[in-house]
Amino acid sequence: MAPAPFTGDSREVDPGACFDWLRQGWAMFLVNPGIWIGVTVLLLVILMAISIVPLFGQIAAHLLVPLFGAGMFRVCLRISDNEEPAIADLFAGFHHQAGQLVMVGVFFALGIFGIAFLAFLLVSGGVLGGVVTGKVAGFGVALGGVMLAGLLVMVLSVPIIMATWYAPALVFFHDMKPIDAMKASFAAGARNWLAMCIFGVFLVVALFFAMLPVGMGLLLLLPVFSGAVYASYRDIFMGS
């Protein structure tokens, strides 16, 4: 009898597990830093080249992120299975479940651009209200619109990020449908909200410092955090 399809059930882990995820991410990087740096350089070059194209490039980049994310997870899987990773693994998502991974990118892009549109409406409304109100009071109205827009973006981005955090891994490794994978990813993030918050804080701080030396820190940050996210996926969904 064929095994039951993967349902995306997740488990709750200790908040301190995020530190072990980071440790595992660092350990994966040390196994083969050359391949990791090569993969990261190639990824950054591709994304920067795509993003140069006005509007279309930004949309395309959002659609391709899940495919490249699956490729990074493929590198992680090879390392965890004591296999030799290759730079070509970055494109594994283009060969398996590519259409489903693109749909994850579509839903992600719709969410992000939808939030950006709402923020634009708030900012433009605040500026218009400021012009109508007058100089001093108008500045306060405009500033209030900008602050409200920023808060809205922060709050509404969280569920979208949660829904796409594990979706590429669930689609790529378990052939889940995009919507089901995003629901499972969101549920896992909500169930482990404290661990994810701590992990997110480390990511934001690390990203800040990684961008200081002309972004060179990304050559270390992206591999380590890819490994850490893979480790968290194994911990939360596979119990290993």
Predicted feature locations:
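Hydrophobic alpha-helical membrane segments
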Residues: M1-S240
